[in-house]
Swiss-Prot record:
PPR repeats lie at residues 38-68, 69-103, 104-138, 139-172, 206-240, 241-275, 276-306, 307-341, 342-376, 377-407, 408-442, 443-473, 479-509. Coiled coil: none annotated. The keyword Repeat applies. It holds the Pfam family PPR_2. It comes from Arabidopsis thaliana (Mouse-ear cress). InterPro entries: DYW_dom (IPR032867), E_motif (IPR046848), Pentatricopeptide_rpt (IPR002885), PPR_At4g14850-like_plant (IPR046960), TPR-like_helical_dom_sf (IPR011990). Keywords: Repeat. GO terms for molecular function: RNA binding; zinc ion binding. It comes from the Eukaryota. The lineage of its organism: Eukaryota, Viridiplantae, Streptophyta, Embryophyta, Tracheophyta. Residues 621-715 are annotated as: Type DYW motif. Residues 514-589 are annotated as: Type E motif. Belongs to the PPR family. PCMP-H subfamily. This is Putative pentatricopeptide repeat-containing protein At3g23330.
Length: 715
């Protein structure tokens, strides 16, 4: 018996000496054999079972106790919580209270965590009140659990201030509770003030303490405060670790301060921690956001161990820097390397398909998303809506949108902009109004979308209403994109002088891109006099605006003013400017075929020319007359018609038709504005071939069908 008592005393001091299920069962059996299984010893065995996550064995023994001690209750409640059985943990707490047992400070952290995970703020507040009545609100771990609960559930009706919880916690040390609790608290922007207050009164601080406050400041956008804490840390004997540096590096990418970032990179190399995956991912992200993608690639290539975060960082970096093909290539390598793509990876790579207008790759990614179980992720679903819209399949985009269970301003904006770019202006406006009725507050991007929609269908009065409501109703500042959309609207409506005055009186300095919207309208309405004034405005603020030079050359050519055009082209040559080659591409059998205006190198060029000659005869019979006014060469009319014949969009459309079954929709993408003559020609081709032809240029989608275009001949 004395040996059993000695064993009990030893286990009371250190029950974690039992490391396996067999050892725990042997101890349990020994207590039974020696008839020493009292409530105290049973509670110890229950504690050991729960430490080993043997919930079934713990509950069997627990149920044999007529009046379980607090230690037994604590062990069972904690085990329920650790195994995510939160409702059972709370039910056990209620049962414990009903039994007359008074919980000690070891019980409350598990109970409060269960309240947090169940999102049961009301129950949590009642527990908080009970804690205060017992005088246990000063316990360090209980206070941390309270902070975590309020940080996560604040804003759901709580009348208790998070700061007050800390006011009642006089005990503070560098080991101030569970690290998960600290991490969860510090990332909440509204919790950073409370974190700071705790940090300031801590008598001793360690690296974890500094990491918590630095990460909190950084993730709350309080970069100067984060850097101040790094400098303060440098005055102590503490040294930054990988978590410190991975928190600080993103700050420099936000500041675009790559010099300081490289200094930290040097420190990392000297300390021999450059292979750390967290630091590596942060370095990749920092260099990418600083437009130094080659440095990102070098850091990535030197990582011995690459996790999903490091892969995602470089994929996102490629997309941020407009290197969409590289992003898709790296994503394929990621999948080949057996790294399972997560939500972040899909959210990064899907926009690459949108920018490249590669529908077949977008569909493949959509399949990956569904197989990976991410179909309900709001960020991925919104990216898919945007991708299908920009790849010319607005029906698929709308189908995904209509199936989304949760909609935010991003998903609403994606579908509104999609309909706007496809010429469905009235539908886009209707969706914008529905978004407001659903209680979703439009942001600045949403207003760009609805103003674009109004512009494409000529809703002048509605556009003015939306533009003015930004500041008066929603407190949003109008930015350059909003002014450009209104200027474009006025120009499309033929109100060129009003558009000129509107831009001249902008609250912010108009850029070349804003003036360029009006220049395009001058070209459409053939107002050369105003176009010259607008062009000079553009060249003043953006002397290398290639689009403005090309538009003015087109206008001079169409008016037969070859001398002025020659002067402008000489001006371009002196500046070293060259017209961007007109390129169009089309996907065919999972392969992208590209065409450049005037290029005859494509293997199918003979068949393309044969088709175009045949269809041209039918077009001319139905009234087609080539519009050669935009040809920038002083040559005879026959030569001009030959030049138009080789435009890239026409070649791509012809290639699509001769390589698909009758009735198949043709989708073509062009890098610049579709030319006037090709626009007319493709309308005829759509009628003759009975095809729907969708052309995406650099401003919108043109849906050609039965001889008409969705843009109403205004783009």
């Amino acid at each position: 018996m004395s040996s059993s008592k000695a064993l009990i005393k030893t286990l009371i001091k250190n029950p974690t000496r039992i490391k396996s299920k067999s050892q725990a069962k042997q101890l349990h059996a020994q207590f039974i054999r020696t008839q020493s299984l009292s409530h105290t010893s049973a509670s110890i065995v229950i504690s050991i079972y729960t430490n080993l996550k043997l919930l079934h064995e713990a509950l069997l023994l627990f149920k044999t106790l007529k009046s379980p001690p607090v230690l037994a209750w604590k062990s069972v409640i904690r085990c329920f919580t650790d195994q995510s059985l939160f409702s059972k943990a709370l039910a056990s707490f209620v049962e414990m209270r009903a039994s007359g047992r008074c919980p000690d400070h070891n019980v409350f952290p598990s109970v409060l965590k269960s309240c947090t995970m169940m999102m049961d703020l009301r129950f949590g507040e009642s527990v908080h009140g009970f804690i205060v009545r017992l005088g246990m609100d000063c316990d360090l771990y209980t206070g941390n659990a309270l902070m975590n609960m309020y940080a996560k559930l604040l804003g759901m009706g709580s009348k208790i201030s998070v700061g007050n919880v800390f006011d009642e916690m006089p005990q503070r040390t560098s080991n101030s509770g569970d690290e998960d609790v600290k991490a969860e608290t510090c990332i909440m922007p509204f919790g950073i003030d409370s974190v700071r207050r705790v940090f300031e009164v801590m008598p001793r601080k360690d690296v974890v303490s500094y990491n918590t406050i630095i990460a909190g400041y950084a993730q709350s956008g309080m970069y100067e405060d984060a850097l101040r804490m790094v400098r303060e840390m440098g005055t102590t004997d503490l040294k930054p670790d990988s978590f410190t540096l991975s928190s600080v590096l993103p700050i420099f990418s936000e500041y675009v301060d790559v010099i300081k970032g490289k200094e930290i990179h040097g420190y990392v190399i000297r300390k021999g921690i450059d292979s750390d995956v967290y630091i590596g991912s942060s370095l990749v992200d920092m260099y990418a956001k600083s437009a130094r993608i080659e440095d990102s690639e070098r850091v990535f290539s030197r990582l011995y161990c690459r996790d999903g975060i490091s892969w995602n960082s470089l994929v996102a970096g490629y997309v941020q820097n407009g290197r969409y093909n590289e992003a898709l290539r790296l994503f394929r390598q990621m999948v080949t390397a057996k790294v399972k793509p997560g939500a972040v990876a899909f959210s990064s790579v899907i926009p690459a398909c949108a920018h490249l207008a590669t529908l077949h790759l977008g569909k493949q990614l959509h399949g990956y998303v569904l197989r990976g179980g991410f179909g309900s992720n709001i960020f991925i679903a919104s990216a898919l809506v945007d991708m299908y819209s920009k790849c010319g399949n607005i029906k698929a985009a709308r189908k995904i949108f209509d199936r989304m269970n949760v909609l935010d301003e991003v998903s609403w904006t994606a579908i509104i902009m999609g309909h706007a770019l496809h010429g469905h202006g009235h539908e886009a406006v209707s969706l914008f109004e529905e978004m407001k009725r659903q209680g979703v507050k439009p942001n600045q991007v949403a207003f760009v979308a609805v103003l674009t929609a109004c512009s494409h269908v000529g809703l002048v009065d509605e556009a003015w209403g939306y533009f003015n409501s930004m500041t008066k109703v929603y407190g949003l500042n109008q930015e350059l994109e909003h002014y450009a959309a209104v200027a474009d609207l006025l120009g499309r409506a033929g109100k060129l002088e009003e558009a000129y005055n509107f831009i001249s009186k902008m609250c912010v300095e108009p850029t070349g891109s804003v003036w360029s919207t009006l220049l395009s309208s001058c070209s459409v309405h053939k107002n050369l006099e105003l176009a010259e004034k607008v062009a000079e405005k553009i060249f003043t603020v953006d002397s290398e605006n290639m689009g403005a030079y090309v538009l003015m050359c087109n206008m001079y050519a169409s008016n037969g003013r070859w001398k002025e055009m020659a002067k402008l082209r000489l001006r371009m040559r002196k500046k070293g400017l060259r017209k961007k080659p007109a390129c169009s591409w089309i996907e065919m059998k999972n392969k992208t075929h590209g065409f450049v205006s005037g290029d005859r190198s494509h293997p199918s060029m003979d068949k393309i020319n044969e088709f175009l000659k045949a269809v041209m005869e039918q077009m001319e019979k139905e009234g087609y007359v080539a519009d050669t006014s935009g040809v920038l060469h002083d040559v005879d009319e026959e030569h001009k018609r030959e030049l138009l014949f080789g435009h890239s969009e026409r070649l791509a459309v012809a290639f699509g038709i001769i390589n698909t079954e009758p009735g198949t929709t043709i989708r073509v993408t062009k890098n610049i504005r579709i030319c006037t003559d090709c626009h007319v020609a493709i309308k005829f081709i759509s009628k003759i071939t009975e095809r729907e032809i969708i052309v995406r240029d650099n401003s919108r989608f043109h849906h050609f069908n039965r001889g008409n275009c969705s843009c109403g001949d205004y783009w």
